[in-house]
């Protein structure tokens, strides 16, 4: 019989909220022997009026810097996993550069990789309509093909 949650997706953005979400995912993984995928997303959409790069494109040096930062975030989670005695081989990491929105990228990655749970952190203070859930988390909850656990 298939475990309830065999593949867990956790978006990491370097915030305390995303690290807290990773802790929940680790705990769930311990219970169900789930595989965890940590992703960090760089939205590379060309923005009119940005001063970064030609015509607002994100310069390669920034992308490399962001990727290095994301690897540090992943390592922080992996250290927690080691400390808790879980198998690191069950954890995958991926830095994604995309012109799509962060929400769309999370959803596509979840579907493509057959995630059966998304665990996402939110600070929940991005405006009146989204007072309880942040805009990215709200979009993921609204459109995800699988259950979403929102951590505050």
Protein language model features and the residues they cover:
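Structural beta-alpha unit
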Residues: 1-3, 79-118
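Small/aliphatic-rich secondary-structure junction motif
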Residues: 2-58, 83-86, 90
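Short, solvent-exposed amphipathic alpha-helices that sit
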Residues: 24, 68-80, 105-107
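General small-molecule cofactor/ligand-binding pocket signal
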Residues: 39, 92-96, 149
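A short acidic, glycine-rich active-site loop
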Residues: 57-73
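Gly/Ser-rich helix-loop-strand patches that form or flank binding pockets
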Residues: 108-152
């Amino acid at each position: 019989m298939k475990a309830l949650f065999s593949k867990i997706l956790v978006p990491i953005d370097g915030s305390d909220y995303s690290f807290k979400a990773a802790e929940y995912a680790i705990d769930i993984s311990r219970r169900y022997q789930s595989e965890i995928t940590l992703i960090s997303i760089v939205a590379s959409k060309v923005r009119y009026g940005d001063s970064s790069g030609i015509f607002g494109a994100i310069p390669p040096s920034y992308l490399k810097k962001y990727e290095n930062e994301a690897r540090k975030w992943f390592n922080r989670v992996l250290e927690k996993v080691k400390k808790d005695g879980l198998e690191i081989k069950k954890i995958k990491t991926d830095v994604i550069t995309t012109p799509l929105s962060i929400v769309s990228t999370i959803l596509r990655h979840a579907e493509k990789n057959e995630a059966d749970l998304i665990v996402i952190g939110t600070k929940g203070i991005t405006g009146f309509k989204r007072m309880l859930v942040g805009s990215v988390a709200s979009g993921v909850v609204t459109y995800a093909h699988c259950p979403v656990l929102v951590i505050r």
